[in-house]
Amino acid sequence: MFCSLIAVASNIYQKNDNLYAGQATTNEVRNAIKDQNHVFVYYYQINCLHCKRVSPYLIPMGEKMNGKFLILNIEGDQKSWESYKINQTPTLVVYKNGRETNRIEGEQTKNKYKNFFNSES
């Protein structure tokens, strides 16, 4: 029984780990904000409980934004926290023409993220 629980937990961890497979570097995020006229950036931390809860539905929604969605792990990256004015994770920010136009901070419902993407697309 115990081995079965470990196997299930390991499988869930691997599925969540795969969500972050396409994450961006800080340089890629900086360049995308500067060069693209419209981009969403999801700031998260690997050890953030709230990020672990929302990532399974937030990331697939963001990936439907046709290349206008980037994922950045800011755990331990104080410069990114300050540069992008991140107060907490998860944080989803939309940039248009190099400037932040809106953000949603903290753990939110699937519907709230969906509405955010729809209103900012």
Residue ranges and their predicted role:
Residues 50-65:
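Typically the conserved alpha-helix immediately C-terminal to a functionally engaged Cys/Sec
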Residues 48-51, 92:
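The canonical Cys-X-X-Cys-His
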Residues 20-37:
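A short beta-strand-turn-helix
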Residues 43, 62, 66-79, 88:
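Thiol-based oxidoreductase modules, predominantly thioredoxin-like and allied folds used
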Residues 93-121:
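Non-catalytic, surface beta->alpha helical segment in thiol-disulfide oxidoreductase systems
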Residues 84-93:
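Structural micro-motif
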Residues 34-46:
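Short active-site neighborhood of thiol/selenol oxidoreductases, capturing the structured segment around
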Residues 1-19:
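N-terminal targeting signals for export/organelle localization
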